[in-house]
């Protein structure tokens, strides 16, 4: 079996908003990596045994006395090190160089003139017409290195940053003031490939096929002949988890699909058809709509709704699990960003804006072992594995759907009438986006039910019915987003269809709020 963890990169996080992008790029190259906080111990690094180390950017200033520093062992481990932005600055400071606050801060696009073609910049040039090689990069820094550590040379400059890149080839230490991990840096992926493959010597074994092989073997090794229970929602994470488990243990997997009445139009039937009929999984469908809606009566505060939905789900799942007395393991679709966010919250550095629908987990008394086959994977990797396992691309690439479902897309108190109207309106919106070839041009699109009525006219009659809002956004990382500029004729067609085909809706509006200041979901 291929050892997919044999070569691996350790990324030390100094707090940059782009740090997870570094990890995703390294994985995209085909090499395993992990993301750890900057203050790890020498013992932890030795135990991980990285093939190379990357120091991320960060919001702090190396000119401040108590700013974060890389563990000294990083520079004594005998492996290549790449410092990015703040990572380059702390490398310079810790190895005897000097940094200062810059008079000319650089934020945005910049052109770096390469001064030497070391191994990091091998074969890189974004401007073939210039006499010297240049790179088109993305800068985001206020400090700069002003004196090199001993043994280093300048490998890149900009008009306002005389040391935009540096290297000590003998020790295989490299620093870049720009961000190769973002797509704005034209040859960023090639630069990271030069480091990970060319300099560190990593083999590209982190592929979907190898991951599936290893995950299936690990599941068999972990659970043996025991039975496993999984809450299957039909979302990407739980779906891929189900297929990995099914491949490993077959009928010993029991999937529980809780139909909470807060799903999209016909979604429950689609889940049963896909996983029961097509893939042959053991699925128990629990029709719990009344139970959820009863629990949500009178609750209009968004966070209280989320908590209630989460609690009822646990109660329903608990009731079903008690019927499966031979089950010894609980499977969850935890992915790597969940692990990172959980670790961050334990340090006290994370601020809860909206609670995650899985927070709290199952009751302690259930005493089940935990199986998390996706724990090492980013979402894009989960999709690639799902595709390799036979899931249709249109399902894997659907827009995100919140864990509480329509519970956070019906504003205020949730009622069955509201959910039914919203389901129909949303289905029309999505159908028309597909028809107009706009669905994959936007990052997320959905309809929101507003608990207000508006006067309308249908034929010769007056109507006084509900209002819905259409929402479509464009984003790269969902941390910030722009509202999508859908064509007016498309919006008009969607509005006309909803008002004419959904009895009970008299007005359709379009949300033109960006994030920030608004969030993508309304609740």
Curated annotation (Swiss-Prot):
Residues 8-205 form the Glutamine amidotransferase type-1 domain. Pathway: Purine metabolism; GMP biosynthesis; GMP from XMP (L-Gln route): step 1/1. GO terms for cellular component: cytosol. One of its GO terms (molecular function) is ATP binding. Its EC number is 6.3.5.2. PROSITE patterns: GATASE_TYPE_1, GMPS_ATP_PPASE. The active site is at residues 85, 179, 181. Residues 206-398 form the GMPS ATP-PPase domain. It catalyses: XMP + L-glutamine + ATP + H2O = GMP + L-glutamate + AMP + diphosphate + 2 H(+). Signal peptide: none annotated. Transmembrane segments: none annotated. InterPro entries: Class_I_gatase-like, GATASE, GMP_synth_C, GMP_synth_GATase, GMP_synthase, GMPS_ATP_PPase_dom, NAD/GMP_synthase, Rossmann-like_a/b/a_fold. It comes from the Bacteria. Pfam families: GATase (PF00117), GMP_synt_C (PF00958), NAD_synthase (PF02540). Keywords: ATP-binding, Glutamine amidotransferase, GMP biosynthesis, Ligase, Nucleotide-binding, Purine biosynthesis. ATP binds at residues 233-239. NCBIfam families: guaA_Cterm, guaA_Nterm, PRK00074.1. Homodimer. Catalyzes the synthesis of GMP from XMP. This is GMP synthase [glutamine-hydrolyzing]. It comes from Actinobacillus pleuropneumoniae serotype 5b (strain L20).
